[in-house]
Structures are given as structure tokens and as C-alpha cells.
């Protein structure tokens, strides 16, 4: 099982799908990496040599933001938005959806479990 950027890459899958286990690398970029290095994207990950693994790692380090550095950049961007108190930063701060979704109903994942409010007493008496 090859290891790239601290992530175990599955042996039994094609290299193009194995590379998508890295954070920040989707199928398009995985194929792009294989094409740049002249590796057949449909070959199993178990068939690539240690030299190829080294070449892939070097290319990813040099040309792409993946794994730790990408996670760090995303976190820094969010904290910067919170710091300058932009609309998106405020939404992040109060744990509400950031991209314009409705919140009257739904948004439960972001808002957390429902906070139940007791009903009014005496409503039945009015009928």
C-alpha cells in the first residue's frame, strides 16, 4: 500500500481513483497528475513503482495544494473572514449556513439539534 503525503493509498483500485484519497485531489486532478507523469491512470496502484510514487509526491508538493497545507489555508481563510466580520465570517461565527440556504426550515446539520420551545398554556381554553 503506497503512502503519499501521509495518506495510505489503496492497492486494489486504479491509480486515478486511489489518488482521490488525498484531500484536495479529485478525479480530474488525479488524471491530470497521471497524464503529466506519463503513468497509465487505469493501472492498479499496486503496479506503480517506488520511483513513480516519489515522482507523484514531488509533483504534488511542487504544483498542488493538498492535505495539510490546503486544510491550513482553508482554516486561515475562514478565520480571516471571521476577523474582518464579513457577512460570511459572521455566518461562520454563529454556526449558520454560509452560502445563502434557507434557515426557517432545514439547516439542521449546521444549527444542531432542535431547541424545543414549550407551547402556550391555555390555548385549549379559548375554543
UniProtKB/Swiss-Prot annotation:
Entry-linked InterPro entries: Rbsml_uS13_C, Ribosomal_uS13, Ribosomal_uS13-like_H2TH, Ribosomal_uS13_bac-type, Ribosomal_uS13_CS
Quaternary structure and partners: Part of the 30S ribosomal subunit. Forms a loose heterodimer with protein S19. Forms two bridges to the 50S subunit in the 70S ribosome.
Disulfide bridge map: none
Molecular function per GO: rRNA binding; structural constituent of ribosome; tRNA binding
Protein task: Located at the top of the head of the 30S subunit, it contacts several helices of the 16S rRNA. In the 70S ribosome it contacts the 23S rRNA (bridge B1a) and protein L5 of the 50S subunit (bridge B1b), connecting the 2 subunits; these bridges are implicated in subunit movement. Contacts the tRNAs in the A and P-sites.
Keyword Membrane: no
Keywords, alphabetical: Ribonucleoprotein, Ribosomal protein, RNA-binding, rRNA-binding, tRNA-binding
GO biological process: translation
Region of interest (Disordered), residue spans: 97-127
Entries under PANTHER family matching the protein: 30S RIBOSOMAL PROTEIN S13/40S RIBOSOMAL PROTEIN S18, SMALL RIBOSOMAL SUBUNIT PROTEIN US13M
Family listed: Belongs to the universal ribosomal protein uS13 family.
Name of the protein described by the UniProt record: Small ribosomal subunit protein uS13
Compositionally biased intervals (Basic residues): 101-118
Entry GO terms, CC: cytosol; small ribosomal subunit
Coiled coil: none
Keyword Cytoplasm recorded: no
Amino acid at each position: 500500500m503506497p503512502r503519499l503525503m501521509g495518506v495510505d493509498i489503496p492497492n486494489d483500485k486504479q491509480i486515478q481513483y486511489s489518488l482521490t484519497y488525498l484531500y484536495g485531489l479529485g478525479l480530474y486532478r488525479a488524471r491530470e497528475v497521471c497524464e503529466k507523469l506519463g503513468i497509465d491512470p487505469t493501472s492498479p496502484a499496486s503496479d506503480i513503482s517506488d520511483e513513480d510514487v516519489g515522482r507523484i509526491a514531488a509533483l504534488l508538493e511542487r504544483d498542488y495544494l493538498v492535505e495539510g497545507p490546503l486544510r491550513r489555508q482553508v482554516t486561515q481563510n475562514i478565520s480571516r473572514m471571521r476577523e474582518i466580520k464579513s457577512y460570511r465570517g459572521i455566518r461562520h461565527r454563529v454556526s449558520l449556513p454560509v452560502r445563502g440556504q434557507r434557515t426557517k426550515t432545514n439547516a439542521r446539520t449546521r444549527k444542531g439539534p432542535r431547541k424545543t420551545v414549550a407551547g402556550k398554556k391555555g390555548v385549549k381554553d379559548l375554543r
